[in-house]
Amino acid sequence: MSYSSHILGYSYIIKGDTFIMNTKIDISKNMATQNSNFPILAVSNRHLAAHPFLDQIERVCQAHPAALILREKDLPAEDYKTLATRVLPICQHYNVSCILHTFWQDALALGCTCIHLPLPLLRSLAGADETALEKLAGFSVIGTSVHSVDEALEAERLGATYVAAGHIYVTDCKKGLAPRGLKFLQTVCKSVSLPVYGIGGIKFDPAQWQELESAGAAGGCIMSGMMEL
């Protein structure tokens, strides 16, 4: 079985800085994503990038994942915002939805209505003042990461529109920690009405994607493989 990702459908226009890279690369040998409907979310990690980071982002976008999560949450807020102003136009150029991470005020300031929030942050915002709640209502996509059924149910109550559940397979990102596995993923998928994306140890492997799909996942997230393109 062969696979390709599709676009989530959320888009926006960034005015002003229109930094676009023009690297021409052959990614076909790296991607098992041609001609299918199983969505793959690319997750960034500049520490793993095989090329200069913006160059790497363009390589990822040329592969046309369903979306790119700009995860660089260890950056200071101002540095993250600066990076986002560079990444968003690249995503727009390739018609790839960009989901910003953690810094929701900056996302709104940049006109991006897709955000991924750590669950503790989503929890605190949901219990915050009315102004914060009104601002969160400006997002069309609100994702969060979960590691249990209870967390998935909580995320749904708090207004998340998707969850990333993991880690599903063995991964270097979670060294020494046993994967939660496909049974866990299946249970999460059955427990919530939200789209659930598997994360952790996911590769460009159609057989693996079939396992995720059979467990009920709406798609999968790939970090390391995307940063190695």
Positions of predicted regions on the chain:
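Serine residues within intrinsically disordered or low-complexity segments
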Residues: S2-S5, S11
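Conserved N-terminal beta1-alpha1 strand-loop-helix module at the mouth
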Residues: Y10-L122, L136-T161, K203-P206, M227-L229
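Small side chains
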Residues: A42, A67, G198, G219-G220
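Charged helix-capping and loop-helix junction motifs
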Residues: K81-T85, L177-L185
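Glycine-rich phosphate-binding active-site loops on the catalytic face of alpha/beta enzymes
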Residues: L119-G127, A164-G176, F204, W209-L229
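Short amphipathic alpha-helix with an adjacent loop that forms part of the alpha/beta core around
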Residues: T131-E134
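Glycine-rich adenosine-cofactor-binding loop
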Residues: G181, V196-D205
